[in-house]
Amino acid sequence: MEWSEPAIVLSVAAFGESDLRTIVLAETHGAWHGLARGGAGRRGAPIWQEGNLINARWVARLPEQLGSISGELVHPAAAIAMADPLALAVLRAACAVAAGALPEREAHRGAFIRLARLLGGIGIAGTALPALVRFELELLRELGYGLDLSSCALSGAAEDLAFVSPRTGRAVARGAAGDWVPRLLKLPAFLLDEDAADDKADLAACRDGLALTGHFLARDAFGARHAPLPTARLDLYDRLTRRLNGDDDAR
């Protein structure tokens, strides 16, 4: 059995002296494990970096086997992100969330496209964080935990949506929130406009977006697996909080 198609490197782990056990995300094959022989060597290391887009080829004698995976580098997102600590933190968080939440060998085309879009623009200032929030929303939707941000759960209004119920995942209008505001999750405005430029979202709105998706990822996507949110995702949120509080070391 074998397949070949573009894929995103989600995770790599040492396996022996020079091989790597990898997880990639392919558009039609989903999250897929494989053994990259020589992946830790001089030629393989630049390819097998989390976040890179590759042309992957997986081969095994039987479908249930781990199999061997090889790849050709298409887009070096990991190397590009190295120039910006925040972009690198976003890349690592996105890959960790995808690797931990997506079931193995199950296609999730929307999540793949969103993640590929995030990684393709990882070097464009100001776009990575909003793209991560949009990716996580799509991931939740594809896993069956989608949020309803179309109208207010209380009034039915489609205007002035500002919050989300942490219980139902439905939007709530500012005027209808009343005394419930302290219990609701903030809904950043950039999520209400699919065509909004991601580089216009400020840092506080991005943190609100990550708090929103993080709540439902932890409760539903990872909660269903009895697993915590990945450390890389928790670290990113902490970095944003410290940066908003004026900590220059969190940049």
Swiss-Prot record:
Protein species of origin: Acidiphilium cryptum (strain JF-5)
Gene: recO
Protein family according to the UniProt entry: Belongs to the RecO family.
UniProt xrefs under HAMAP family: RecO (MF_00201)
Name of this protein: DNA repair protein RecO
GO cellular component assignments: bacterial nucleoid
Signal sequence segment: none
Gene3D superfamilies for the chain: Recombination protein O, C-terminal domain
Alphabetical UniProt keywords: DNA damage, DNA recombination, DNA repair
Role of this protein: Involved in DNA repair and RecF pathway recombination.
Gene Ontology process terms (BP): DNA recombination; double-strand break repair
Cited Pfam families: RecO_C, RecO_N
